[in-house]
Amino acid sequence: MTPRTRADLETIPAYIPGKNFPGAIKLASNETTLGPLPSVRDAIADAAANANRYPDNGHVALIAALADHLGVATENIAAGCGSVSLCQELVQATCNDGDEVIFAWRSFEAYPVVTQVAGATPVKVPLTADHGHDLDAMLAAITDRTRLIFVCNPNNPTGTALTKAELERFLDAVPADVLVALDEAYFEYNRSDADGIELFRGRPNVVVLRTFSKAYGLAGIRVGYAVADPAVVTALTKVHIAFAVNAVAQAAAIASLAASGELLARTDGVVAERKRVRDALLAAGYEVPESAANFVYLPLGAHSGAFAAASAEAGVLLRPYGDDGVRITIGDPAENDAFLAFATSTEARSLANVAVRA
């Protein structure tokens, strides 16, 4: 006889991270190719020297630095072990068994996982034909059991982004007792007019999630944050796992904020490469939604798995999404060229069932 665990865990999908193989070019996990700045590495080393001490569970210095950086009050900020942990904490803080969490699909793969782990019911709303959020359908999906709505902007994995006007109309139509999480993990790559922090102001049912994993290059350290009404922040602290944001992560995040100008300037290069890669794929006959993130998406349908497998054989790792599509991280120019060499080949176009445009 084995110990009993929750029977419903059998129905919960496992989160599948991007793969990695020695010597391969990894364009599967939306990581930045550039490491931390010297000042950030120094902060990491200094914090590691005191690893025998517990971290600050209140994240006081980090929250103060974030408040100054964002122009919000400290009581509006909660920190977490990556923004994905805050996603789960939001579900735990808002939902009882059987309550509903709405999100677009496809969107961030963790949403159905964290929803079901908390005993809530995921409500998946299909994307539009152009691979963006169907906000009207999401509004129509709201019931008296809806407690939380995730809006991933830009959307992962499709890269599509909503405008300020679209989000304002949506947020103003959501009932005041339903929390809306604007998940802005890729905010720093988005050149549209939508800024979750500005949308949060004056809307107590809006929470903004951001991370240091992407543009700040701290994916391996795990630190993210939420900006929310003080009542929501208090609820998050009650479900937060003690000491989850370690001292090294807090120190690295503070140092990264101090160097944010230099770090965020790197995103301009990613945005330029994103356009170059997308233009080349369009010229090769692919459908490529316009992306506002550090990746592009190919909606290849049933051809997705074979395309990603062939790319791996060619030495470039991508992220397939079942029978929906393939996501390609924007790497450095040489990495992107390696992917484009594969994608524009006769073999790849045949696998993807695309033809060269006239």
From Swiss-Prot:
Q: Which GO terms describe its biological process?
A: L-histidine biosynthetic process
Quickly give the catalysed reaction: an aromatic L-alpha-amino acid + 2-oxoglutarate = an aromatic oxo-acid + L-glutamate
Which terms does the record give in the GO molecular function aspect?
A: aromatic-amino-acid transaminase activity; histidinol-phosphate transaminase activity; pyridoxal phosphate binding
Give a yes or no for keyword S-adenosyl-L-methionine in this entry: no
Q: What SUPFAM superfamilies does the entry give?
A: PLP-dependent transferases
EC top class, as a word: transferase
Q: Name one Pfam family in it.
A: Aminotran_1_2
Report the EC number(s), separated by commas if there are several: 2.6.1.57
Cofactor needs: pyridoxal 5'-phosphate
Q: Which residues carry this modification: N6-(pyridoxal phosphate)lysine?
A: K214
Q: Which keywords annotate this record?
A: Aminotransferase, Pyridoxal phosphate, Transferase
InterPro entries of this UniProt entry? Aminotrans_II_pyridoxalP_BS (IPR001917), Aminotransferase_I/II_large (IPR004839), ArAT (IPR024892), HisP_aminotrans (IPR005861), HistidinolP_aminotransfase (IPR050106), PyrdxlP-dep_Trfase (IPR015424), PyrdxlP-dep_Trfase_major (IPR015421), PyrdxlP-dep_Trfase_small (IPR015422)
Family to which this protein belongs: Belongs to the class-II pyridoxal-phosphate-dependent aminotransferase family.
Q: Known HAMAP family for this protein? A: HisC_aminotrans_2, Phe_aminotrans_2
Listed under subunit, the entry gives: Homodimer.
Function as written in the Swiss-Prot or TrEMBL entry: Aminotransferase that catalyzes the conversion of aromatic amino acids and 2-oxoglutarate into corresponding aromatic oxo acids and L-glutamate.
Q: What PANTHER family does this protein map onto?
A: HISTIDINOL-PHOSPHATE AMINOTRANSFERASE, HISTIDINOL-PHOSPHATE AMINOTRANSFERASE 2
Write the protein's name.
Aromatic amino acid aminotransferase
The organism's taxonomy opens as: Bacteria, Bacillati, Actinomycetota, Actinomycetes, Mycobacteriales
